[in-house]
Amino acid sequence: MKQNAKVYKGNTAVMKAVNAGEISGGVIYHYYWYGDQAKTKENSAHTKLHFFGNGDPGAFVSVSGAGVLASSKKQAMAQKFLKFLTSKAGQEIVADNVYEYPLLDTRTGTNKALAPLDTLGAPTVDPAKLNSSTVVDLMTEVGLL
């Protein structure tokens, strides 16, 4: 891969290159593809998603988190927002408009276009055991950051 890989600036650029036939495949976050499919399909009309599965590292599931800074001058509003974000209504927005997997229903979520999370065959990884400085170094090295 080091000798033959092409580096693109971002998920959309990779998807455009695959769509145009410039490259035969690329690795992107699924929600870029679902978002484009739901709108114009301009960058994804000639593409399909492939999920690595079988515990392959390429099938990793990244996680997102949210919190409130202790220094925030709007603690109550921020807490209210987080409460909404983690509610059923908030998670429906996450799944239906951003194409992320919702926290509350990881089997299918509300967006039926998403492949059920429990069918993706992701490797077993404990996010709490990941070394964030090593991850950042690797992502920087390959141009993701």
PLM region descriptions:
Residues Y8-T12, V27, S71-A76, K88, ...:
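Soluble non-cytosolic domains of exported or imported proteins
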Residues K16, A20, A76-K83, E92, ...:
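Solvent-exposed, polar/charged alpha-helical surfaces in well-ordered, non-transmembrane soluble domains
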Residues N19-A20, K41-S44, A59-V61, K73-A76:
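Extracellular/periplasmic catalytic domains that process cell-envelope and extracellular macromolecules
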Residues G109-L145:
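Extracellular/periplasmic bilobal clamshell ligand-binding domains
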